[in-house]
Amino acid sequence: MSKPVNLVLLYGGKSGEHEVSLVSAASVLKHLDSEKYHIIPIAMDKSGRFHRHDYNDLLACSDKLPVVTEKSTPLEGLLINGRLAVDAEIVFPVVHGPLYEDGCLQGLLELAGVAYVGCDVLSSAIGMDKDMARRLACINGLKSARYKLLSWHANASERQQFCHEVASEFGWPLFVKPCSLGSSVGIHKANNMDELNAAVADALRYDEEILVEEFIVGREIELAVLENSIPCGKPRVSMVGEIKVNHPDGYYSYTAKYLESSQTDLIIPAQLNNSLEEQLKQAAANIFSYLKCKGMARVDFFVNDKTEEIYFNEINTLPGFTSISMYPKLWQATGIAYPDLLDELINLAMIHHNCRQHLVTNYL
């Protein structure tokens, strides 16, 4: 039997999605094969400090993993002298939000010369920015909701003018979103000017730039994409899933997603005609390729039921892995069990790392 691969499970972090990460990490820990991997859990607290745990100490944590315990060991940093602080061949990041999902962490791991699961620096950075992702995703005629951007540099007068302009152009309701955040953190539905002003102020607490977009009447559709391990092979796309929100918020808010998820239905497979389903799968594969994604991504759309028009919403290059997360659920329904999915992602990460190791970096 081959020696287990030393794998760092990295979770937590100082972002608005810290709590989501703890839940995702517990689910990943549960499904990783301990005979294949020597698992080294490393948590990041909300101040950015690192804490190493023993795998066996966390096995009883079924709902979410702890950040600090009596048995955890503080680390000086994730890297020491430019290399990973622990002996590991690969890092599995189960972290979300700025610094971790936007290419920063990926760049750090590149500098450390260690393999890591998921997209690289470029695709992570593009995917995290809703504006940039839409610009690339919609280059061949695919639509997205109309939107306008607002920077935190705008003064009170400029913010007020902006709010009146978007309301006049797009009508009500409007959606306000931080440009580079996920898990519905900082997202609001605004039905009038007072709500819009409050939503803009709150969203700017989480990001330097926000977008305000028109409301699209339609169904919320999600697809999971997995890179093909065959060189030059087309991305693999799961069956189509749908999110039906019965929550009073009226949309897939943070509360509806994580705190009161019983009021949200995840429908797999979504009931769509064959033609529309194929269009969605092709669009998801195209977007994955346009953004040069590696490993995995979840691609989200809105579909107008009457016209069957497809609107790209966003791409998530480090999707959630909680028990209710669409990414693993879609692959389970498509025929790839959760542990096999993790194995596949780790294998893809090792392939990319080995390729990078063979690149020429000395030109003399």
UniProtKB/Swiss-Prot annotation:
Keywords: ATP-binding, Cell shape, Cell wall biogenesis/degradation, Cytoplasm, Ligase, Magnesium, Manganese, Metal-binding, Nucleotide-binding, Peptidoglycan synthesis. Binds 2 magnesium or manganese ions per subunit. It catalyses: 2 D-alanine + ATP = D-alanyl-D-alanine + ADP + phosphate + H(+). GO terms for cellular component: cytosol. Mg(2+) 2 binds at E314, N316. The keyword Magnesium applies. Mg(2+) 1 binds at D300, E314. The keyword Oxidoreductase does not apply. ATP binds at residues 167-222. Transmembrane segments: none annotated. Its cofactor is Mg(2+); Mn(2+). Pathway: Cell wall biogenesis; peptidoglycan biosynthesis. Its EC number is 6.3.2.4. GO terms for molecular function: ATP binding; D-alanine-D-alanine ligase activity; metal ion binding. It is found in: Cytoplasm. Residues 134-347 form the ATP-grasp domain. GO terms for biological process: cell wall organization; peptidoglycan biosynthetic process; regulation of cell shape. Cell wall formation. Belongs to the D-alanine--D-alanine ligase family. This is D-alanine--D-alanine ligase. It comes from Legionella pneumophila (strain Lens). The lineage of its organism: Bacteria, Pseudomonadati, Pseudomonadota, Gammaproteobacteria, Legionellales.
